[in-house]
A protein has these predicted regions:
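Membrane-interface helix-loop junctions in multi-pass transport and translocation proteins
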Residues: 148-153, 163-206
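Short membrane-interface helical motifs at transmembrane helix boundaries
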Residues: 99-117
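Helix-terminus/linker motif at the lipid-water interface of multi-pass membrane proteins
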Residues: 23-41, 112-114, 176, 236
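Alpha-helical transmembrane segments of multi-pass membrane proteins
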Residues: 117-141, 167
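Membrane-interface junctions at transmembrane-helix termini in multi-pass inner-membrane proteins
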Residues: 135-157
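Small-residue-rich midsections of specific transmembrane alpha-helices
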Residues: 45-71, 93, 130-136
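Interfacial/gating helices of multi-pass transporter permease domains
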Residues: 32-53, 120, 185-186, 226-231
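N-terminal membrane topogenesis motif
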Residues: 1-24, 80, 84-87, 220-235
């Protein structure tokens, strides 16, 4: 009964935090529209559409896979198994996301010219491509923290991510973009990318602190690669 109540309050906290962050994000979108104008917003929406497509491909179902496999290991009390799951998920995510990132990087001129129709978006697309593996590795850690029930820490990091994203974006818009739509797109993508890096580093730091407190005991190795592929590939 106690565990059920904890799960309920964790889900409630995560839902409430996500709603609050979405409201803040909507307010920030209003600010952006006033800063970069209709032309900048139009270009930004096109860049974000391409980015979301690439991010979906780069994730390759790894966030859900990390959450599912971590939950299995935590439920069985296999703490070394959790380490193996995270290692396998990191390797899978890095390879998958790097392949997609390279594709976006080298196809960015074609996408900017033929699909978006504006070469000013080229730099923004390449900034996104450079940080795509960081975003996807952050997805692995998010899946782990969700499965491990460490919702409060996850919410705190998500709030930090939002603050960093807005702060870096505002800084770049006010001191560098100077009303240029192409630079404005770079500012927004750059702010989001910097926030993703902060998120990944924060979650890795929290995970390292947890690792130092785990019991040191022998466990029979449980195969991870096959389980990961069975879960991740259908979601890719």
């Amino acid at each position: 009964m106690r565990r059920t109540g904890t799960m309920f309050y964790s889900a409630l906290l995560l839902t409430g935090a996500n709603l609050a962050l979405r409201m803040v994000s909507m307010g920030f979108q209003v600010y952006l529209s006033g800063q970069i104008g209709a032309a900048g917003i139009g270009l930004l929406q096109l860049v974000l559409s391409v980015s979301m497509l690439a991010m979906t491909a780069g994730m390759g179902g790894i966030r859900t896979s990390a959450m599912y496999l971590t939950a299995e290991e935590v439920g069985s009390g296999r703490w070394l198994g959790v380490r193996r799951v995270l290692s396998a998920c990191f390797l899978y995510s890095f390879l998958f996301s790097t392949a997609v990132a390279l594709l976006v990087w080298f196809c960015a001129p074609l996408v900017a010219e033929a699909w978006i129709g504006d070469l000013r978006t080229l730099a923004a697309l390449r900034i996104f491509a450079a940080f795509l593996p960081v975003v996807c590795l952050g997805g692995v850690m998010t899946g782990y923290f969700t499965a491990a029930g460490r919702i409060r820490e996850l919410v705190a990091v998500e709030i930090l991510e939002q603050v960093v994203s807005m702060a870096v974006t505002v800084l770049l818009l006010s001191h560098w973009a100077s009303g240029d739509p192409g630079r404005a797109c770079c500012a927004v993508v750059g702010g989001s990318s910097a926030a993703s890096l902060v998120t990944l580093l924060s979650l890795l730091f929290l995970r390292s602190r947890e690792t130092n407190r785990l019991p040191d005991r022998q466990e029979a190795p449980v195969p991870v690669a096959g389980r990961l592929l069975r879960v991740a590939l259908p979601l890719a």
